[in-house]
């Protein structure tokens, strides 16, 4: 797992982690046995993972683990210790940080056409984010 700490606002930061096949099977529809343990071993905390729909729906997480399994393509939060997860292959993960707000988006061509990135930024602004930093993750194409 590749882990990187990025600024999330004055005196705060967020950790980003990117996995590959060598880290195990993190698929939402993958084998349930051991999946929660694998997640906890990779990054501690209550995970919010999404059932990506290739659209522009954004989940706002107000407590640890809220929105787990929601049908959406982005999640945002101000909750310290929250783990927001999206899964990608040929789509691109985008991580946003700013002013104590973090967000993550699953960004494929359908989601981009639907407006997932502006929707994520708008939701973050509603939570108080001003200056934003966007980090583009890896994909297979």
How would you name each of these model-derived features?
Residues 1-141:
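Active-site microenvironment for binding and transforming phosphate-containing groups
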């Amino acid at each position: 797992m590749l882990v990187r700490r990025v600024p999330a606002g004055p005196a705060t930061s967020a950790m980003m982690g990117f996995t590959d096949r060598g880290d195990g099977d993190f698929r939402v529809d993958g084998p349930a046995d051991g999946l929660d343990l694998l997640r906890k071993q990779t990054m501690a905390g209550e995970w919010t993972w999404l059932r990506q729909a290739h659209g522009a729906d954004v989940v706002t997480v107000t407590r640890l683990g809220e929105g787990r399994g929601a049908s959406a393509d982005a999640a945002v939060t101000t909750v310290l210790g929250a783990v927001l997860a999206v899964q990608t292959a040929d789509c691109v993960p985008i991580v946003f940080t700013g002013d104590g707000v973090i967000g993550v988006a699953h960004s494929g061509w359908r989601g981009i056409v639907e407006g997932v990135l502006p929707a994520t930024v708008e939701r973050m602004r509603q939570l108080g984010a001003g200056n934003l930093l966007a980090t583009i993750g890896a994909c297979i194409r």
